[in-house]
């Protein structure tokens, strides 16, 4: 598989990796030897297209003792990465690597609408089911279906097959809807105590 390597982002130092969560913490290592979350998603950016960034991901579920009980794999497609622009709103670039919580639509709506009501504004109705929370400089970063870099302004598009198109020097993913539904079912089944995503790269 060919890779589009122009504008490949600068690799951070080990200190930056540790600070931003590329060195992943496994559940079960807190003071009570119990997991802080039920699901951990580890995503590693590996391929860079003209308008896209592609990661492999593994979502792992843990029980109350911190033992692995289930897992699933797939791809995420994001927009082209440029870490100088990653924290700029509406930049149409992949978000900054690091560790984030994934929260359901209802939780984010409740937070947003509390602020809107205080201002006397009408409630907002969010479009997607799951969101990546508190992304620096960005808002509305969701996980939803799609095919290529034109289908995302920063969101993560899951899929189960990756294709590189030489003529446009870019990537597409396939079966996004079915992979999205599989991932969301995984979140609903195992993520009642929380979901964390670690985004890193090679």
Annotate each PLM feature.
Residues 14-173, 177-195, 201-202:
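Cell wall/extracellular polymer interaction/catalysis modules
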Residues 1-12:
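Hydrophobic, membrane-inserting alpha-helical segments
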